[in-house]
Amino acid sequence: MNRFWRVNRAVTIVSAAAMSLALAGSASAQETFKLGIVTFLSGPAADSFGVPARNGAQFVIDQLNKGSAPSPYEKVGFGGMKIEPVIIDENGGATKQVQELRNLYQRDNVDAVVGYIGSGDCLAVAPIAEELKKLLLLFDCGTPRIFEESKYNYVFRTAAHATMDNVALIRYMK
């Protein structure tokens, strides 16, 4: 994975956390902002997608928590709250990811979740976030079906879907 995509993923994760502050009213009373990060840490997608995404996210979070990177409120972390990542492996399939997402929101009490690469996982977890009325930012789901088949108020995507990428590639190759 080239440097552009690693930086893009890290910026996505941090942007999601900032956006979550506006949506998560309860977070303002906390000392920490818990951010769930779901990406492949094992399996075939780990080396090219998941581990670089995790490393980039951890680097940016560490910089924000130290006050070494610009943050939205000119304070350490976000608005003075330290960012506490809760990192989960996406490997294991859609059924596992539905339970993992519920655990992140209900057991771990994360304020928001950023992640998901596998299209099947994205399709499975999006309705759960909507049901629980919790912010979910999908950063690399290739399927266009997520927003074609359903309407969400709490689920967002930061990257183009595979159809857009493929059309752009074909036009470029012409």
Residue ranges with predicted function:
Residues A16-A17, A27:
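Cleavable N-terminal signal peptides
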Residues G36-Q58, I88-A94, I117-G120:
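Extracytoplasmic "Venus flytrap"
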Residues T95, V110-K174:
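Extracytoplasmic ligand/sensor domains, especially the bilobed periplasmic-binding protein
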Residues M81, Y105-A112:
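Short acidic/histidine-rich motifs immediately flanking catalytic phosphotransfer sites
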Residues M1-V14:
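Bacterial N-terminal signal peptides that target proteins for export
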Residues R54-P85:
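Signal peptide-proximal N-terminal region
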Residues L23-A29:
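Sec/Tat signal peptide C-region and signal peptidase I cleavage site
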Residues G77-G80, V86-A94, A160:
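Short beta->alpha junction loops
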